[in-house]
């Protein structure tokens, strides 16, 4: 009887150990991560954040901020966000699946599927037989954000993907195909259209039937309307004058394969575990193509030590895999450490968060290292700079305007000297030049005005306007400045 009791006790302990594994993340680490997110939400203009961590067999979720500030709906692991360019890994998997199934080869020329597509380089047509599907997969086609980002049309009709790629016909390439890597989001729109041509299905239907369902990604959506129906879709915000404001960005349905898949932290955790080979209940062919998707294109130079795979940036031995994404009112970051079976995903509903800082800080917390002081995102800093400039130039413009107006009413002005006429002429010319430069400013950053108004903070526009107003006001101030009479010595 005693032996039986000992055996029962041992088995009970083993069973309990199996059911309740030791927590990989300590309570103090959890508190530090939550504090990090709360601080980030507050300093980034009340941004909503949803974080998922895979650490071995454990999945931990953290959240902070609001999915909708007006209704005070908090962010949870179920909250849906636009994945932005993290969407590319899904599209990359889809195109590799078609290759695995024998429908295409990534070495096929693009004209095999889109015979009407043609490009030019330095004004001359290029041999389209030399442009393969791999060029689009690895961003070596010559289509880049610098030249082709603003070509993405707005709209949500069923043919927007076709319209988006048709807009690339006869595009001027930034470099000859296969010569170098340079990121261009439209490359994955081309792949999305190839999926439609090969399967005779919409991109959305193919991805839902052949990728999301087999992988059991049940909270991942391709249509904004479907996501809204769940009641879990986060409201997007954009930076504006030291805060974030609600922003309903235009529809870019033609850019869906590159940047507009929608998901939540629960599905992203499963997605990361699938990427690291921790999920067994998926078709075997996915295991093969996922491994293939992590192979970076080493035929061109690395970008900061990373090569581009199929929707992923990877180092040479695939021990570090990541991708980020930014839409007008959402941003994301996913980082995988396959050798450590650790991965982190961050979803946010504004562009004010420095996502890679959060990911690095979480990694430091998990490794027991100190974290760096809070670092703002580039977009947040842009808004701070231009908002500050707007205030300064507006105040100065009003000040000089009021002084000049008072002098105008008092007729407090003497005859204008030739010297002052030269100064006024120079200031007037400067005002005109600044006004012209403000009008063409988007060209300097690779945008047009329509694109700039969608993607950049409104404070950028007001800063340019207030600078022009300041120059005009200061010119009038000099015009109205009273002439100083020369001092005459008394006898």
Show the residue positions of the predicted features.
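Hydrophobic helical h-region of N-terminal Sec-dependent signal peptides
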Residues: 9-13
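Active-site helix/loop module of the DD-peptidase/beta-lactamase fold
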Residues: 27-30, 82-85, 98-144, 197-234
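Catalytic loop of the DD-peptidase/beta-lactamase superfamily, centered on the K-T-G motif
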Residues: 24-58, 62, 249-491
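Positively charged n-region of N-terminal signal peptides that target proteins for export
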Residues: 1-4
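Short active-site loop at a secondary-structure junction
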Residues: 43-50, 71-135, 175-185, 256, ...
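Alpha-helical scaffold elements that line and support the substrate/ligand-binding pocket
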Residues: 51-58, 82-105, 109, 136, ...
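Catalytic-site signature segments of enzymes, centered on catalytic residues
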Residues: 145-234, 243-269
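C-terminal segment of classical bacterial N-terminal signal peptides
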Residues: 14-21
